[in-house]
Amino acid sequence: MIVSSLIFVLISIGIQAACLPESVGMDKLDVTSAEIRMIEDSVGRFETIVLKKLPTDHDIAVRLDPLNPRVNAEVVKENGLVAIVVWGGMISHPKMNPASFYLLLCHELGHFLGGPPLKSRTGWSSTEGQSDYYSAASCVKDLGIDEGQFMDAALALTAIYAEVTRQAPPKLETCDQAVATRTNYGYPATQCRLDTLLAGWNEAPRPKCWFFE
């Protein structure tokens, strides 16, 4: 069953995996009623579709904290509940739209369903790179996102990542030339993350800028 289509939380809960290594705060939060309706519709559809992908003894919930200025999102595994938390700074970011919001939720889900490589040998969370790959290879396609919407969403979401981590904005027409000598279990460079999303969408090999085999 679906625990809840929309849960607003005003306090932080235990963190297991976040889409960004750090958070910055928006100077001003401006979440309009239209944005809230968009989020409600997106969350309900996401939970309904994603529930079918989870083990039968697990539930999914998206928790929103619209008053918190942090620009970030996190996933927490609470026994049989997979809870995705999205903070207000991310919700109200100018680059956030239905497709980029879906891609963000899919990335967080990817920490649970993305598979190896995992962040630790005894943990359950896929690495950031693997979560990015899963989000594009599987999850957003299940949600009916088309290629044009995906490209815009991938560029928008990684531009937010670049802004928060103070990196150059990633570009579709270039690739990260780095070659990893071992798998990156942390946060790849923003251009590498965009490359990973594109590779996932095209079902191509995971980029060498973070993945080593």
Where are these regions (language model features)?
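Short alpha-helix carrying the canonical HExxH Zn2+-binding catalytic motif
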Residues: 97-110
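C-terminal capping/extension segments of zinc metalloprotease domains
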Residues: 17-94, 140-213
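Solvent-exposed, polar/charged alpha-helical surfaces in well-ordered, non-transmembrane soluble domains
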Residues: 44, 48, 103, 129-133, ...
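Catalytic Zn2+-binding segment of zinc metalloproteases
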Residues: 109-124, 137-144
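N-terminal signal peptide c-region/cleavage motif recognized by signal peptidases
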Residues: 12-14
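Soluble non-cytosolic domains of exported or imported proteins
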Residues: 33, 37-41, 95-100, 122-129
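Sec-dependent signal peptide recognition
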Residues: 1-9
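Long alpha-helical scaffolds
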Residues: 3, 70-74, 106, 131, ...
